[in-house]
Amino acid sequence: RKAIANAKENFWTKGQMAEMALDAYFQQGRTVIGGLGELRGNGQFVRREALKRCGGWNEETITDDLDLTFRLHLDNWDIENVFDPAVEEEGVVSAIALWHQRNRWAEGGYQRYLDYWDLILKNRMGSRKTWDLLVFLLSQYILPTAAVPDLLMAIARHRLPILSPMTGLTITMSMAGMFAGLVRIRKQKGLNLSSYFMLLLQTVRGTLYMLHWLIVISSTTARMSVRPKRLKWVKTVHTGSN
């Protein structure tokens, strides 16, 4: 599990802290039911044998952990996610830095589908992992991409968005998962009534923060649909603990 080392710094880092709790909760849930566990950057351990069989690290991607995730599963390896201990990562502290980082994540996440779609459709991962993958493709990429034009059309025509039931369900599941993840992390320090109220506020704030993904995914989809693969990587600035 990734944890944000500077989580208390500002709104953006607090949002990233809640986001990592949500991601850890979902990732563990996916692996428990035999779904597709994913690598998450720093703190990951990869067997040398597995890396050799998959052809090593891919130099033609900007998110090597996401790319390797697919190649490992296509080669019938499993990825386990450990909730404890957490590996700390310095969160970005500004909207601009967040924009560059999340665009890189979104583009790399998209690119792996484009690179391996034929093998995925051949069910090389197995039925359970393939269905799990398609469900998260729908919720992480397709639905956010469709939600933005749907909302704009709803405003222009003075009607409710067509996708509002699916969007509402996705947001509800996200909030529930985020709260459950935060509770599980907080249990290490003990819980009382005020703790639950604080975690609820963190969940609401984290959900508002997560709305940036709608813009990121939509813009990335539009860009990748008309531009060739470009592998643009903007370095994330880290300052350390001073």
Which residues does each PLM region occupy?
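Membrane-embedded multi-pass helical conduit in multi-pass membrane proteins
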Residues: V135-R223
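Active-site-adjacent helix/loop segment of glycosyltransferases
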Residues: W99-Y141, P149
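Catalytic donor-sugar/metal-binding loop of nucleotide-sugar-dependent glycosyltransferases
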Residues: G34, E60, T69-E88
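Transmembrane helical bundle of ABC transporter permease
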Residues: M17, V93-A97, S194, M198
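Long helical/loop segments within the catalytic core of UDP-sugar-dependent glycosyltransferases
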Residues: R1-I62, W99, N103-L114
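Catalytic cores of eukaryotic secretory-pathway lumenal/extracellular enzymes that build
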Residues: G41, N81-V82, E88-H100
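Short, hydrophobic alpha-helical packing/hinge segments within bilobed ligand-binding/sensory domains
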Residues: L68-T69, L98
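Membrane-proximal soluble regions of multi-pass membrane proteins
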Residues: Q101, W105-L114, S195-G240
